[in-house]
Amino acid sequence: MRPSNRTPAQSRPVTITRQFTAHAEGSVLVEFGDTKVLCTASFEEGVPRFLKGQGQGWVTAEYGMLPRSTHSRMQREAARGKQSGRTQEIQRLIGRSLRAAVDMKLLGENTIVIDCDVIQADGGTRTAAITGACVALVDALNWARGKGILKTNPLKFLIAAVSVGIYKGEPICDLEYIEDSAAETDMNVVMTETGKIIEIQGTAEGEPFSHEELLSLLELAKHGIREIVDIQKASLS
């Protein structure tokens, strides 16, 4: 039995609130249960130096957690003077995932900067961030088209992400913190709206997992992501 009494395949309630802030071209508050992440997408002219003159754009991401997003206060990374390895890993994951969804040639020499700030953490912050950032990205691209900056929509497909894992010997979907901290296997999966895989991050925290367990986890993720994409589409309609 899961602590929340959810079934193994059941995700937490997912809520996507668009236009959450006034200034960003795209802004979303995404909630996976008690995990809440603010995702903004800023449209900027120009590209990093390594892309100048190549006629293509760039999508990059930054990620952070507010000091009291967790049970006890954590020091701001700015105050420490450096980002943790975890932060760098997550923001690279978000950027890679979103770049897979965008035709960089159609974006032109423009950059979209995604900022994901965790307001409250209860497991699955990176998967929530990817899911919300995708919707913010769509709004930023639509803003650019409305301004005449882009003639064609560079978005190839929606993407979403969910965590899966083995908890007390059973494969489950969308782990909250109490499950994540005790899971024998922990995995984050990013997929397109058609179920194609963009990224898998999987680790055996305790006992190694079998090929059969891997396949069952991927099926759980595919089912969960399909439901999340439906919520993304409903929020954009």
From Swiss-Prot:
Keywords: Nucleotidyltransferase, RNA-binding, rRNA processing, Transferase, tRNA processing, tRNA-binding. The keyword RNA-binding applies. SUPFAM superfamilies: Ribonuclease PH domain 2-like, Ribosomal protein S5 domain 2-like. The keyword Transmembrane does not apply. Gene3D superfamilies: GHMP Kinase, N-terminal domain. It catalyses: tRNA(n+1) + phosphate = tRNA(n) + a ribonucleoside 5'-diphosphate. GO terms for molecular function: 3'-5'-RNA exonuclease activity; tRNA binding; tRNA nucleotidyltransferase activity. Pfam families: RNase_PH, RNase_PH_C. GO terms for biological process: rRNA catabolic process; rRNA processing; tRNA processing. Its EC number is 2.7.7.56. Phosphate binds at R86, G124, T125, R126. CDD domains: RNase_PH_bact. Homohexameric ring arranged as a trimer of dimers. Phosphorolytic 3'-5' exoribonuclease that plays an important role in tRNA 3'-end maturation. Removes nucleotide residues following the 3'-CCA terminus of tRNAs; can also add nucleotides to the ends of RNA molecules by using nucleoside diphosphates as substrates, but this may not be physiologically important. Probably plays a role in initiation of 16S rRNA degradation (leading to ribosome degradation) during starvation. Belongs to the RNase PH family. This is Ribonuclease PH. It comes from Shewanella halifaxensis (strain HAW-EB4).
